[in-house]
Design a protein with these regions (language model features):
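Generic recognition of flexible, low-complexity loop/linker segments
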Residues: 41-44, 82-83, 93-96, 192-198
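A generic structural signal for well-ordered alpha-helical segments enriched in polar/charged residues
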Residues: 12, 16, 124-131, 193, ...
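M16 family metallopeptidases and their MPP-like homologs
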Residues: 1, 50-72, 78-188, 203-211
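In a subset of proteins, long, contiguous C-terminal domains/tails are tracked
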Residues: 185-229
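Short amphipathic alpha-helices in soluble, non-transmembrane regions
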Residues: 6-15, 120-125, 222-223
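His/Glu-based metal-binding/catalytic segments typifying zinc-dependent metallopeptidases
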Residues: 1-87, 229
Length: 229
């Protein structure tokens, strides 16, 4: 109802927006929007027997971390450490992480019988990276797996989606090429440098778990709020 009440005034304002913006910057006529982000840990309870367990956060200090190496570290975690700890040992149907060039990242599992053990595995991912010391052959296999994901043939829709993402993000082609070169030249030392980023995300990020009510209540101290879906 509030939206319906304000809609006429908004549409009227929209009609004059382009005229007011002519000859100047859009920032001169736009009201600045600042979103205040507050970390919150939520447990969302359902009748399900399993959980979807996620942590999302940001590393504010990315100094010393090569952006292209993030793809290699992600591949290493997804198909190595997390696969073994959360899928094989923990029994989850799936698990993954994402490490993004701006310092943001997340860990997530689905159809996961675990909760606290999964969160602990996320937090220990940094230790795994920090102690990474694989033989050159193993590292080469990881690099090949990473670069093959980047070079997978894409249908027109996927090419368009990628191009749109690059355009909206204003990422120059030179930066993408530099990151690709960093993937190919990745070393064990480069991988170990990503540990601080993984630690920041897992230790200071927000937790969100959707799943079994009893399991969530057993771990209620992890959450700021509990909701019933």
């Amino acid at each position: 109802k509030e939206i319906e009440k304000e809609l006429p005034a908004f549409l009227k304002r929209l009609d004059t927006f382009e005229q007011e913006a002519e000859g100047g910057s859009l920032n001169d006529v736009m009201t600045p929007f600042v979103m205040e982000l507050k970390p919150v840990n939520e447990g969302i309870m359902t009748p399900a027997e399993v959980q979807y367990v996620a942590i999302a956060g940001q590393c504010k200090d990315m100094s010393g971390i090569k952006r292209g190496v993030l793809d290699v570290a992600r591949h290493l975690l997804n198909f190595g450490y997390l696969w073994n700890e959360v899928r094989v040992k923990g029994g989850a149907y799936g698990v993954s992480c994402q490490l993004i060039r701006n310092g943001e990242g997340f860990f997530t599992s689905y159809r996961d019988p675990g909760l606290g053990s999964t969160l602990e595995a996320y937090r220990k991912a940094a230790d795994y990276l920090r102690s990474f010391d694989a033989e050159e052959r193993e590292l080469l296999k990881t690099i090949i797996g990473t670069i093959s994901g980047l070079d997978t043939p894409k249908p027109p829709a996927a090419k368009g989606k990628r191009s749109m993402g690059v355009y909206l993000s204003e990422i120059p082609e030179e930066v993408l090429q530099e990151e690709r070169d960093q993937v190919l030249a990745c070393s064990g030392e480069d991988i170990r440098a990503v540990a601080d980023m993984a630690e920041a995300i897992a230790s200071t990020g927000s937790i969100c778990v959707i799943g079994n009510e009893n399991h969530i209540r057993e771990e209620k101290d992890l959450f700021d709020k509990l909701l019933t879906l």
